[in-house]
Amino acid sequence: MSRIGKLPISIPAGVTVTLKDDVVTVKGPKGELSQYVNPAINVAIEDGHITLTENENAMLDNPKQKHAFHGLYRSLVHNMVVGVSEGYKKELELVGVGYRASNQGNIIELALGYTHNIFIQLPPEVKVETKSERNKNPLILLESCDKQLLGQVCSKIRSFRKPEPYKGKGIKFVGEEIRRKSGKSAGAK
């Protein structure tokens, strides 16, 4: 039995959870999310808690897979409950001379030192806001109820100009430490 999977998930006020045909649907003030759950895992909703247990009758190729599924689906359902009740936020920082970001609705325009600007169409579930103050690095603020989708969008934006180790220029998460390298040593033989 998975240690993470054993923990029950408490359902906060204003959130409703339904189970139909191995699909868990969570509705809350921030939105609605659905997740398919493998038949090897049983889902029970009772007394304001969601509990996931391993189905002893389920046959899988590898018995260890059932333990892995137990922890995986518990984490996915927990992320859905937190997402629809509180939401998830991530901040990206653009470090570099002339790096800019602006948004029109759900389209981000990035100026990252290339000969052309980059336009990124975001999914409707992700809300975006850009901040740029004088003498500070521009910020991209992203918010969504779907943690997985938010991570994918942030990763896609970051992939256009990953931070480089010599000067630290690029797109990074706020608070992320970039491992720096020293340049060429002068006169090294």
From Swiss-Prot:
One matching Pfam family: Ribosomal_L6
GO MF term list: rRNA binding; structural constituent of ribosome
PROSITE patterns: RIBOSOMAL_L6_1
InterPro entries: Ribosomal_uL6-like, Ribosomal_uL6-like_a/b-dom_sf, Ribosomal_uL6_a/b-dom, Ribosomal_uL6_bac-type, Ribosomal_uL6_CS
Keywords: Ribonucleoprotein, Ribosomal protein, RNA-binding, rRNA-binding
Record GO biological process: cytoplasmic translation
Gene Ontology cellular component list: cytosolic large ribosomal subunit
UniProt xrefs under Gene3D superfamilies: Ribosomal protein L6, alpha-beta domain
UniProt record similarity statement: Belongs to the universal ribosomal protein uL6 family.
Subunit architecture: Part of the 50S ribosomal subunit.
Function: This protein binds to the 23S rRNA, and is important in its secondary structure. It is located near the subunit interface in the base of the L7/L12 stalk, and near the tRNA binding site of the peptidyltransferase center.
Protein name: Large ribosomal subunit protein uL6
UniProt organism field: Bacteroides fragilis (strain ATCC 25285 / DSM 2151 / CCUG 4856 / JCM 11019 / LMG 10263 / NCTC 9343 / Onslow / VPI 2553 / EN-2)
